[in-house]
Amino acid sequence: MKILILILLMSPFVASSERMNEECSNVELYFKSPQDGFKSKAKEFKVEFGSKNILISPAGVKVEKVKECFVSGHHHLIINGAYDVLDNKKQPIPYGKNILHFGGGQTEANLSLPPGRYSLQLALGDYEHRPVAKIDYNELVISEIINIEIMP
């Protein structure tokens, strides 16, 4: 009987923990546009960033955590694998020609690229440009890599 009572008392905590882990795993960063395989004859094109369960906030502004899985930050666009956030999990994402920062909290941008093939990936950075993790540094908030081509 004591075991049954203990199980009944603990079950809300187990359900709450499962729900929290589910919410944490639903954090997502992705490209609304362009889509993987995009081809264009125009050098300039619009890139739209998508996010799920993320508060997009400007760089330099520390947002207080309001719950365990609260995730906030701003977008970084990495072109042609110019930087690997997975290899530099605790380092600020640097600035560079192919590492674009959207520290104002922007969710879209117009890019101009010369003809060629490109890979694009989004990474979420915190107020100090460090990569943001879902729960711990085992899983960073990054998008899938997409491939595009700007035609001559």
Label the predicted regions:
Residues 19-45, 50-54, 152:
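Short, compositionally biased P/S/T/A/G/V-rich stretches that sit at domain boundaries
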Residues 40-42, 56-60, 85-87:
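Short, solvent-exposed loop/turn elements at domain surfaces
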Residues 49-55, 123-128:
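Generic short beta-strand segments
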Residues 3-12:
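Sec-dependent N-terminal signal peptides
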Residues 15-17:
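Boundary at the C-terminal end of the N-terminal hydrophobic targeting segment
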Residues 50-67:
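Short amphipathic, basic-aromatic surface patches that mediate peripheral association
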Residues 65-115, 121-150:
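Extended, well-structured beta-strand/loop surface patches
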Residues 37, 115-116:
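Beta-strand-connecting loops/turns
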